[in-house]
Swiss-Prot record:
<dbReference type="InterPro" id="IPR013931">
    <property type="entry name" value="Svf1-like_N"/>
</dbReference>
<dbReference type="GO" id="GO:0005737">
    <property type="term" value="C:cytoplasm"/>
</dbReference>
<dbReference type="GO" id="GO:0006979">
    <property type="term" value="P:response to oxidative stress"/>
</dbReference>
<comment type="function">
    <text>Ceramide-binding protein that may transfer ceramides from the endoplasmic reticulum membrane to the cis-Golgi network membrane, and is thereby required for the biosynthesis of complex sphingolipids.</text>
</comment>
<keyword id="KW-0539">Nucleus</keyword>
<comment type="similarity">
    <text>Belongs to the SVF1 family.</text>
</comment>
<keyword id="KW-0963">Cytoplasm</keyword>
<dbReference type="Pfam" id="PF17187">
    <property type="entry name" value="Svf1_C"/>
</dbReference>
<dbReference type="GO" id="GO:0033106">
    <property type="term" value="C:cis-Golgi network membrane"/>
</dbReference>
<keyword id="KW-0256">Endoplasmic reticulum</keyword>
<feature type="region of interest" description="Peripherally associates with membranes">
    <location>
        <begin position="1"/>
        <end position="18"/>
    </location>
</feature>
<dbReference type="InterPro" id="IPR051385">
    <property type="entry name" value="Ceramide-binding_SVF1"/>
</dbReference>
<dbReference type="GO" id="GO:0005789">
    <property type="term" value="C:endoplasmic reticulum membrane"/>
</dbReference>
<dbReference type="InterPro" id="IPR033394">
    <property type="entry name" value="Svf1-like_C"/>
</dbReference>
<dbReference type="GO" id="GO:0097001">
    <property type="term" value="F:ceramide binding"/>
</dbReference>
<keyword id="KW-0472">Membrane</keyword>
<keyword id="KW-0333">Golgi apparatus</keyword>
Amino acid sequence: MLKWVQGGVSALTGSAEPEYGAEAFESVSKSVDGKNPYGSLTLPELNWLKPAGSNVETQTFYFFSKDGKQFGHVQIIHSNPLGIQNTAQFTFRLSNADKPEENVWSSTNVEEFEPVGPNFTAKGPMDGVNIKLVPSVDDDGKTTEAFHVKIHVSDEVKLDLTFTRSVEGFKIGPTGQSKYGEDLNNPWGAMRHSFWPRASVSGTIEVANKDKMELDNDFGFFVHATQGMKPHHAASKWNFITYQSPKYSAVVMDYTTPPSYGSSRVTIGGVASAEKLLFTSANATVEHVETKEDEEVGWQVPTLIKFECEGPKVDVADEDVDKPENRGKAVLQGNLTHLERMDVMAEIPAFLKSLASTVSGTKPYIYQFRNEMELELEIDGEKIQDKGQIFCEATFIS
């Protein structure tokens, strides 16, 4: 995830935190220990939270063309990294598997913005930003929700996309939150994720000097993320994957806190079929099976990765979550095709970048990968092999 991009300059304002220890962090997994981790996602829980103080909040919409050739994402970042002034930014990625030279990355600050409920508007030199949650009806006639995303803030990119929820959304547990603080009943920070693991995407993408791209019920994924503290104080590294195929979808989100919070790890996820959410997990795992050093910056970058997500089916009662017949397991393992390395602090002047790295121990890079991968799924006594598209990120902060 682009968490560090959302608040990179905040590294310039403070040093590493004191060593509070693991006892000053409470993973969301604790709230569901011995219980079904599935938490339903109500409409009010799609609202922007806008926490007080330093924070970063995002809505990110991913799309995959059904032919596997094109992928991208649209992200709105609403942040207050210094706890002083809110800012907003629109980022857009479009990658073409057949013509990588035509890949597009765009980032634009927006003004006069307003997050209200689940919606977001901003004025711009063109038509601005207008993201609105609207009632919708899926192909089977069932009532659902959709985000209508219209963005035109530069000559480079114009978007008109509708992301319609295909299966149940979810969070982990009753709140979806991990908490930071010496008094966890009154935490000074929090991390929260909520997901639409599978969506249908239709609409148009217009990029300068390129043919208009049309999506028609292609694959989509949505995540709403909130960090109620400075990004480099919340996590030292991240792993993320979303998998999409005609039959199945999966997501795993993994992060490790800095040593100031005991290098605690949170790994959550969920798996869906084309028809319904199957199971969620508060104890998923991620392994960098093979790595290669990025000699320029020193990080060990994964070249072969394994994500494992196991948990009870969403309709299983708490007392029955450990019964084998009530559980599902999914494994994503394969080689990674490098898409891009993002130097988060590249635009900060060299002397400030050096200062930030010295003071905060930060050298944040995001490694993005995009390729096909096989999904191994075990559920209801069946072993299923599936093949689909993945987008994966490995983020190193400190």
